[in-house]
Amino acid sequence: MLKNFCITMLVFCLANVSAQNNLSFLNDSYSGINSAVISPTQPFLNPNPWDANLLSADVFLNNDYAYISSQSILGLSNATIVTANPNKNISGENQSNVLDFYNKDKANLLFGSDILGPSFSMSARIKERKYVFGIYSRFRTHASVLDMDNYFRFNNERVSEPNDYTFKPVSGTVMNWGEIGLNFAKSIFPESEKQWILGVNVKYEIGLDAANIIGKNLNLTSSEPTVTQNTTLRNIYATDYDLSASYITNYNFQTKRYEYKQNGSGIGLDLGIAVIDKDKREEKYNYKFAFSIVDLGYVNFKKGINHVFKDGNTIWLQNNPVFENRKFDSPEEFFQTLSSEAYDDANASLQDSGFKIGLPTSINMNYSQRIKKNHYINFNWIQRVPVFENSVKRNNWVNANYLIQKEAIGFGVSASLSEYKDLNFGGYFRIGPLILGSENAFPLLFNHKHLHAASFYMAIKLYPFWDNEMKRHRRQKCDCEK
């Protein structure tokens, strides 16, 4: 039961893994509407008059809790993975294809996916000024847990759990949601020597699934089992606890099917400003500095289920016959059983329905410098700044990349720091309508002793990649008499 209890906390917390956008491609001037999600001003820099995204997907994972030994992401398709078992001498340190666990004091996990559906942007000149309008559809998953006490490390190290252990406060959030966004960008300050750009995204949020767990206090005590109990496991009890869990899901646990419906709604806002230095006769800039704050807002799940466990009975977690070898058919059955142990009432922990989840607010800065024709070096900094209570959190990210970008082809290489400590290398390749990339490419292709992170990006777009700057100049109206 202890493992069920902790795994439930992890699932509810770890589900907040933040999707990491492919910054190398999004720095490409031809990224168009795809770049609006991280910088509302970037579509303004697209030389093409229109741009359409058919489908793009970005998946990001990073954790220091578990790993697969001596494997790559591509190699997983043909691998048989077994879980570490110290009693059988199965360990990731002595064989490959083992799901094993780090024995660190703290556990961290960041995961996310970001799918951009049919989206479109176009530019227009109104009273001799350029405006860009766009609309996009998006499906997002964010989940994370940061600095959670790793109680499992005692079992992993084959040592007895301490007689008394107090968890430090922890919280975690996970959310699946859809998004319909409107992008608008225009130039401002026309008298300035530099070109200033203002960009805005207004978003309608469609809540699908969410979970949030807050652990303000939890104390675990352990003692030796009696001769009639499982002598390989110590008895573990929860005391002095103050825990709350909220969730809502479209997964039907009876039919074991996902049944799509909207469970929440909200409004989101992205704001951005950029300044560029360029010759008015050229499309390409000399340098650019952009700042944006994205994902201001929250999703309200009015019918969400809330459970609170505080100041109840001592809960026997491990070796308790009520829990051992029992399979729970749904989260609600698990919480009702836990409530019976805590309060002698299956419904005592149930509270008023409804909760809110904040969007993964972050500030983003970008500096781009042209080195020579079609060659650019870019620096990006993304810092999470949660605004609302119970917000999902994205990962902090520092990225530098070198790009070569032309109308029909573009490519680049990058180096990144995730959470300011994990160094990753990657890049992207764009040819016509196809874009492939990764900000952490090595785990995709090469075996890692401890495979614990990965990143992949793919997009299919329609845009006039057959066009070029000379053709566009020829089509412009000549102002020869002035």
Regions inferred by a protein language model and the residue ranges of each:
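Sec/Tat signal peptide C-region and signal peptidase I cleavage site
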Residues: A15-A19
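Sec-dependent N-terminal signal peptides
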Residues: N4-L14
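Subset of outer-membrane beta-barrel
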Residues: Q20-K482
